[in-house]
Amino acid sequence: MKYLLLALALTCGWTAQAFNDDDVRMVKSMKKCVRCDLSGAALRNADLSNAILLGANLQSADLRGADLSNANLEQAKLRGANLQEAKLSGAYLSGAYLGAADLSGADMRDAQLYNADLTEAFIGKANLNNADMRQAKLIRADLSESNLIRADMSRSNLSAATLMGADLRLSLLNNAEFCNTTMPNGKVSYDDC
């Protein structure tokens, strides 16, 4: 029985660190890591501006305060990643998966989030001024008190999303889907249910 528990403990210890150390070194030094495994990596406050992380696996990564401005994160997997206060201005996140990610307080001005999946993401108090969020999945996402001025959310799915206190001035919401969506004034919209 002791050997079984030891084997389980060792196996769990090895699987807890999913990222590849070489990939972490490469992304920090060269700012390029295409389709690499950085899941669970500690990249807090890292300077990854202009990095090329196309298709990278950053699930559950700690990117709090990281500078990812103008980074290419197209098709990246960021499920459950912690991006609190991250700098993502001008970042390219088209087709990225950010389900359940924490983007609270993130600077996402001019970010390209076309067709990104932000299902159940927490995006409260984020700056999404002039962001391209066309066709984004924002199902059950929390965008409370976010700056969405001039954001293009055309054809986005905002079902069950929370926009309480968000600033939507000059935003484009053409054909956006609102079903059980809490609007900035606190009223719930069932327009597209």
Model-derived segments and spans:
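Positively charged n-region of N-terminal signal peptides that target proteins for export
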Residues: 1-5
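N-terminal signal peptide c-region/cleavage motif recognized by signal peptidases
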Residues: 13-15
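Tandem repeat scaffolds
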Residues: 19-193
